[in-house]
């Protein structure tokens, strides 16, 4: 039998990750091989956000950045998001160490991860925090989610993955025991056991009323009654006679997306309303949609001491061949003489079933969600590519929807009101 300490955690309520509504509880098991004096037994819950950035000017080597022969300038940043301890021994009011006999001892504890980042109150004007941006200031009111918390850099084989792993948000529970070794204390190397926990706050799971606004936009993230917003293609398509055509997406709910949201159904408020707008009468032409590609782009930024690195990646959500010819004689004529026609994609056998992130995709070790904290910012945008055949000429149009706030869980059910009361309320006489 050897003296050791073991940390045991009760699983989160959902079995996957803790939220600010969960009580993080567990026990510390202290096994003593012989009678021992215990100076202190404690449990610490700590959250940190760490980044390292590399100067672009020094990245001109064929070697991987982690190669010791690669020369670069690096900056580091560490923010303490949360730090709370629970003392288990000695009991409250007892200052001296406690002598315990050879045995196994078990002590319970509990925490709650709530509130905003602890470090925010100490930010200086020169701290270069992403939270200083008004578009992200609401994130400072709540703790950020775990991110890259299971990576230690081992096994990284590409430059792309190396840079992606230079930022992390990690929450740990650590049990420590200061015990006597012979006639001496060993405070610099106490017995300890540490566990990494996964934390995902409610603001990253699904929209919370009045809690968030779209990054870089004044639009409310979820507003089912909002007027449609128009997202136009980056460039017009000019036909042989000088007539121009512009694809547009009109949506009141594309500033955000939940997991399992339908993307092309008209009722979803996403890509269900795609229009072609012509500058004049196009009836002499033929326009056919031949292919549709939808991608989600991720932008992850790390900052440290005023230097910022950005990591870009792309996830293809859908690539579907089509053969839909636009009926140019049925276009709606607008007041300015332009004409528009809607693409009827909601009944397509593939597009009508397409739901966002149905497979609960893990991207580089993380589920898909947006967040911003002091030194890390994770953002997304949609790219819709429409491939046409205009008068037998192949044409490609690109529509960008930026930014898009991505939520990790499905949308909460719509409010349905209270059920009707089946009986008449009683009458009381004075």
Swiss-Prot record:
Source taxon at top rank: Eukaryota
Any one of the GO BP annotations: ubiquitin-dependent endocytosis
Amino acid composition bias (Polar residues), ranges on this chain: 63-72
Region called Disordered, residue ranges: 55-75
Cellular compartments per GO CC: cytoplasm; cytosol; plasma membrane
Keyword field contains Protein transport: no
Keywords: Cytoplasm, Endocytosis
This protein's record includes keyword Cytoplasm: yes
GO function term, MF aspect, one: protein-macromolecule adaptor activity
InterPro entries: Arrestin-like_C, Arrestin_domain-protein
Localization terms from the record: Cytoplasm
Entry similarity comment: Belongs to the ART10 family.
Function: May regulate endocytosis by recruiting RSP5 ubiquitin ligase activity to specific plasma membrane proteins in response to extracellular stimuli.
Protein name as catalogued: Arrestin-related trafficking adapter 10
Record organism: Eremothecium gossypii (strain ATCC 10895 / CBS 109.51 / FGSC 9923 / NRRL Y-1056) (Yeast)
Gene (name only): ART10
């Amino acid at each position: 039998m050897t003296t050791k300490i073991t940390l045991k955690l009760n699983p989160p309520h959902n079995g996957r990750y803790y939220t600010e509504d969960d009580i993080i509880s567990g026990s510390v098991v202290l096994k003593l091989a012989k009678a021992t004096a215990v100076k202190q037994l404690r449990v610490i819950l700590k959250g940190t956000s760490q980044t390292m950035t590399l100067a672009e000017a020094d990245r001109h080597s064929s070697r991987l950045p982690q190669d010791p022969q690669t020369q670069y300038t690096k900056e580091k940043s560490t923010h303490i998001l949360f730090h709370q301890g629970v003392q288990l021994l000695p009991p409250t009011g007892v200052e001296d160490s406690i002598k315990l006999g050879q045995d196994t001892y078990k002590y319970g504890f509990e925490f709650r991860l709530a509130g905003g980042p602890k470090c925010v109150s100490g930010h200086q004007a020169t701290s270069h925090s992403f939270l200083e941006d008004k578009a992200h200031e609401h994130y400072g009111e709540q703790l950020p989610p775990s991110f890259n918390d299971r990576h230690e850099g081992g096994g990284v084989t590409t430059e792309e993955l190396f840079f992606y792993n230079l930022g992390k948000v990690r929450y740990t529970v650590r049990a420590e025991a200061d015990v006597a070794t012979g006639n001496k204390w060993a405070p610099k190397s106490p017995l300890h056991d540490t566990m990494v926990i996964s934390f995902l706050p409610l603001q990253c799971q699904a929209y919370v009323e009045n809690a968030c606004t779209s990054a870089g936009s004044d639009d409310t993230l979820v507003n089912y009654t909002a007027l449609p917003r128009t997202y136009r293609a980056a460039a017009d398509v000019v036909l042989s006679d000088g007539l121009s055509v512009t694809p547009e997406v009109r949506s009141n709910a594309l500033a955000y997306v939940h997991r399992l949201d339908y993307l092309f159904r008209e009722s979803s408020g996403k890509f269900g309303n795609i229009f072609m707008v012509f500058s004049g009468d196009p009836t002499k032409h033929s326009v056919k949609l031949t292919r549709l590609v939808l991608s989600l782009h991720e932008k992850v930024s790390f900052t440290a001491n005023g230097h910022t690195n950005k990591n870009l990646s792309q996830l293809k959500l859908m690539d579907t061949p089509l053969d839909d010819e636009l009926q140019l004689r049925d276009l709606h004529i607008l007041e300015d003489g332009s004409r528009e026609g809607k693409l009827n994609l909601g009944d397509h056998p593939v597009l009508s079933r397409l739901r966002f992130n149905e497979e609960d995709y893990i991207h580089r070790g993380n589920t898909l969600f947006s967040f911003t904290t002091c030194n890390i910012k994770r953002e997304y945008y949609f790219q819709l590519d429409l491939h046409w055949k205009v008068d037998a000429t192949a044409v490609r149009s690109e529509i960008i929807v930026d930014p898009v706030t991505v939520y990790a869980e499905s949308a909460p059910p719509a409010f349905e009101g209270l059920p009707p009361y089946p009986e008449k309320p009683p009458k009381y006489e004075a």
